[in-house]
Swiss-Prot record:
Alphabetical GO biological process terms: glycogen biosynthetic process
Protein name: Glucose-1-phosphate adenylyltransferase
PANTHER family found in the cross-reference section: GLUCOSE-1-PHOSPHATE ADENYLYLTRANSFERASE (PTHR43523:SF2), GLUCOSE-1-PHOSPHATE ADENYLYLTRANSFERASE-RELATED (PTHR43523)
Organism field: Shewanella sp. (strain MR-4)
Gene3D superfamilies: Hexapeptide repeat proteins (2.160.10.10), Spore Coat Polysaccharide Biosynthesis Protein SpsA, Chain A (3.90.550.10)
Oligomer status and interactors: Homotetramer.
Enzyme class: transferase
Pathway: Glycan biosynthesis; glycogen biosynthesis
Gene: glgC
Amino acid sequence: MSNVRYISNLTRETYALILAGGRGSRLHELTDWRAKPALYFGGKFRIIDFPLSNCINSGIRRVGVVTQYKSHSLIRHVMRGWGHFKKELGESVEILPASQRYSENWYQGTADAVFQNIDIIRHELPKYVMVLSGDHVYRMDYAGLLAAHAESGADMTVSCLEVPVAEAAGAFGVMEVDDEMRILGFEEKPKHPKHSPGNPEKCLASMGNYVFNTEFLFDQLKKDAQNANSDRDFGKDIIPSIIEKHKVFAYPFKSAFPNEQAYWRDVGTLDSFWQANMELLSPTPALNLYDAKWPIWTYQEQLPPAKFVFDDDDRRGMAVDSIISGGCIISGATVRRSVLFNEVRVCSYSVVEDSVVLPDVVVLRHCKIKNAIIDRGCIIPEGTVIGYNHDHDRAKGFRVSEKGITLVTRDMLGLPVGYE
């Protein structure tokens, strides 16, 4: 059997579950009215588009999206952008909201979110179940992970990557492996992670992406559901309980293409979210959104093109080293090193620098904004200065991050909130 046909058979026998129910509390007010996977990224996408695109580009066409926290905008986006698959051809992207299928509780943890959908998974008759994190931005060919799982004879395979020890502390599951990448130890979000052999600065962290043999997964979830002391979590409970008696392997994260550096970003804090967007402005960014070999799919709104108007000596509509999305109007204003999402308007004599501006924002005249994240629908009053003096920003009710990024939301401006 050719390698292409072998991979094709593996992906056809796989059902993917994307866990997209988390809030992302370290993003503070940015996720007050949306789940983290519904957060905007890269000018026109949402975070959920990246694991979904990875599935489609990898050949996995049966996908369930598990939702819970403030899921309206997430569900709406997935239905609009990903609802075109044909069930009669064995393709589907389905929404799986918390629905108290087996108890009166909502999803209690990552393992419980899968357990409560066992009947739906079983109906699909997959040989393998892939459980994926829905709140990271990355490019990954899941077919390689599937092939490694099948060839090793593993019961479970955990996708992993090396991260700095300081970054992993309290944030990631950390594992120990032998020379064959079999997992010998696993600790969920330790305060003092064990470093990789021979590298005291790095440790092997779980990406939250797993492959299971289906019946093995069901057996472990049922056992876990009967354990009154369990947190119903893969990292805290399932993995530590099975590594001694079962074959659990680690799979090092690789680029989808040879000779390219693998790309993965957590974007779980205001600083990391801002930084990951800023990286896209490089002439040769680590994440190339223009790569036709691995397209990122999303819901395409029908919008007019961006427009730049006025070319006077005292006001000139211009943008430099920036991403400007559909429907934007830069009217006699200057935008430098910034990411502007759909239908942003920047009015005359204003300057926006080193900032991430989410959709439907209006920046009125004579504003100065730098090192900021402006949430969707904000109307920045005329003459407002943001990002130049952190004490002044805090006095206005804005949030300033550890690294000096200013977050502005509608609520902070006294505008109506509650719908995303």
